[in-house]
Amino acid sequence: AGRDFHNFNVVYRQNNAYKVVAFTATQIPDIEGRLYPSVLSGELYPNGIPIYDESKLEELISEHKIEEVVFSYSDISHEDVMHKASRVIASGTHFKFLGGEPTMIQSSKPVISVCAVRTGCGKSQTTRKIAEILKASGKKVAVIRHPMPYGELAKQEVQRFTELADLEKHKCTIEEMEEYEPHITRGNVVFAGADYQ
């Protein structure tokens, strides 16, 4: 969860040609049974959008007569993606990826994206090193981190971290603190939250 919310926000939130019926998630504790809240999901979804455990994927496809599943997880291997695609296709449903262009954050500044196949590959360390190199060359640096949806999503719409007190202000989890604190102590501004727009 995290990248899927961003993809929804930029591609589907205001697109009445689609009806998004659910998000699925894995790896995030206690996310099942929660809602992507209406304050974030927009006027087409006044009741929010339910979040289910991925184990219910086939059940959701059948129950809601879903025509298309859009894959939006991050940190996953090709093999795992293809297993998920097989589950969807075996259920008689289209399986889709969104291309880069429609999901990119619009910026007037150059952007460097740091991605990897799974958690633990070194994205955080790589991001800190890139920021260090850019700052040493006189550039201003800000870090954007897709959300870690552990807390109350409506209160995580937009987050800006410039000092350690901001971690408490935004009620960050230990995982979030481990990610943001090294940037803050190095003087990097960190932006996170469920809605970058």
Predicted regions and their residues:
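A solvent-exposed beta-alpha-beta segment
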Residues: A1-E67
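Short N-terminal binding/cap micro-motifs at the start of the first secondary-structure element
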Residues: G2-N7, K123, G151-L153
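Short, solvent-exposed amphipathic alpha-helical segments in soluble enzyme
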Residues: V10-N15, A85-R87, I130, V158-F161
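Hydrophobic anchor at the start of a short beta-strand
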Residues: V20-V21, F95, K139-V141
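Short, charged/polar "capping" segments at the starts of alpha-helices
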Residues: I28-R34, I76-D80, G151-L153
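Short, basic phosphate-binding NTP loop
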Residues: S38-S113
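Walker A (P-loop) phosphate-binding motif
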Residues: T103-G151
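ATP-dependent carboxylate-amine ligase catalytic core
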Residues: I133-Q197
